[in-house]
Regions:
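Extended, non-catalytic subsegments within catalytic or DNA/protein-binding/adaptor domains
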Residues: 1-271
Length: 271
C-alpha cells in the first residue's frame, strides 16, 4: 500500500517494497543490502588490505529465462521473460563467501515475486546511473538526491507501513520492527510452512541453530498444533463414545470427588 502511494518508481518506498518482497525469501542480513550511512559505501577490509563491498551489487544477480538462458539485457520489457534469479553472496557473516542460491519466479502472485523485485532493483539502480559493481539498494528523493538505503531508513519505512495497517499499535510494540525484521520474518515463514531445520539453515544461510531464537508462537503454528492432534482427538472421542453407559456415568460422578485430608499415606505398589 505504501509503495502504491509513491509517485516515482525510484522512491524510497518503491525500493522498500522490492527489498521486503525479496527479503521474505532470502532473509538478508542488514549489511547485505544496506549501508550505515546514506552516502558512504560499507566495505570489509581483509588483513592484506584488500577491500570488498558488503552489500549486493547488480553483478551479484544473474537472471534466467524458462530455458535457463542468461538474460543479458535486463529491461522493463525483457523482465517479462525472467523465470529465475541466481544470487551470489561475495562475502557474508558466516564466511561462506561465494555461496549462491537460485530463486524461481512466482508467476501466480507476481506482486509478491522475489525474482521480479530483484529485477526491479537492478533496473532502478541502472536508471539512477549506479555502476553494476556498486551497492544495489539506492533510491532518489523528491529533490533528485540519490541515497543509499540504511538500517534506520528501513526501520522508519517499516514502522510507517505498520502504523498505516495498525494505527492503534503501541509505541513499545512498534519498536520491535527494525531492519532485522526481514531475516526474522523469512525464518518464521519457513517454519510456519513446516520446513525442516536443515532446509531453513540451507536457504537462509545459517551454519548453526541460532535461527531457533527467531521462531515465534504464531497463529499458524497454533492451528497446526491442533491439526496435528486432530486424528488423535478423534480416536479418543470414538473410544469414549464406545464405552458402556454405566462406565461413562461413573466417570462423571468421580469428577466431583475430593481428597480426604484426614487420610494418612496409603501404601500400594500400583497407582
Amino acid at each position: 500500500r505504501v509503495a502504491d502511494a509513491s509517485k516515482s518508481d525510484d522512491s524510497a518506498n518503491m525500493l522498500l517494497r522490492d527489498v521486503v518482497t525479496l527479503g521474505r525469501y532470502i532473509g538478508p542480513r542488514l549489511s547485505e543490502y544496506a549501508q550505515k550511512t546514506q552516502k558512504k559505501v560499507d566495505v570489509h577490509t581483509y588483513p592484506s588490505g584488500t577491500t570488498v563491498i558488503k552489500a549486493f551489487t547488480a553483478n551479484d544477480f544473474v537472471f534466467l529465462d524458462s530455458k535457463k538462458h542468461i538474460i543479458e539485457d535486463l529491461t522493463t520489457e525483457s523482465i517479462k521473460s525472467v523465470a529465475a534469479v541466481k544470487i551470489t553472496w561475495r562475502i557474508q557473516k558466516n564466511r561462506q563467501n561465494g555461496q549462491s542460491i537460485t530463486l524461481a519466479a512466482d508467476n501466480k502472485f507476481p506482486d509478491l515475486c522475489p525474482v521480479l523485485s530483484a529485477a526491479c532493483m537492478v533496473i532502478r539502480a541502472r536508471r539512477l546511473i549506479q555502476p553494476d559493481d556498486m551497492p544495489l539498494a539506492i533510491y532518489q528523493t523528491r529533490k533528485g538526491e540519490r541515497l543509499y538505503l540504511t538500517g534506520g531508513k528501513i526501520a522508519e519505512l517499516l514502522r510507517g507501513a505498520v502504523k498505516r495497517i495498525r494505527p492503534d499499535i503501541s509505541s513499545e510494540d512498534i519498536k520491535w520492527y527494525s531492519a532485522h525484521s526481514l531475516r526474522v520474518w523469512a525464518c518464521v515463514l519457513l517454519d510456519e510452512a513446516g520446513k525442516s531445520p536443515d532446509y531453513i539453515k540451507k536457504r537462509l544461510r545459517w551454519l548453526g541453530d541460532s535461527f531457533r531464537m527467531y521462531l515465534r508462537d504464531t497463529a499458524v503454528i497454533q492451528h497446526q498444533h491442533v491439526d496435528a492432534l486432530r486424528l488423535a482427538s478423534q480416536a479418543i472421542m470414538d473410544l469414549l463414545s464406545a464405552l458402556p453407559e454405566d462406565v461413562i456415568a461413573l466417570s462423571h460422578t468421580m469428577t466431583g470427588i475430593s481428597i480426604d485430608p484426614q487420610m494418612q499415606e496409603y501404601a500400594d505398589e500400583e497407582d
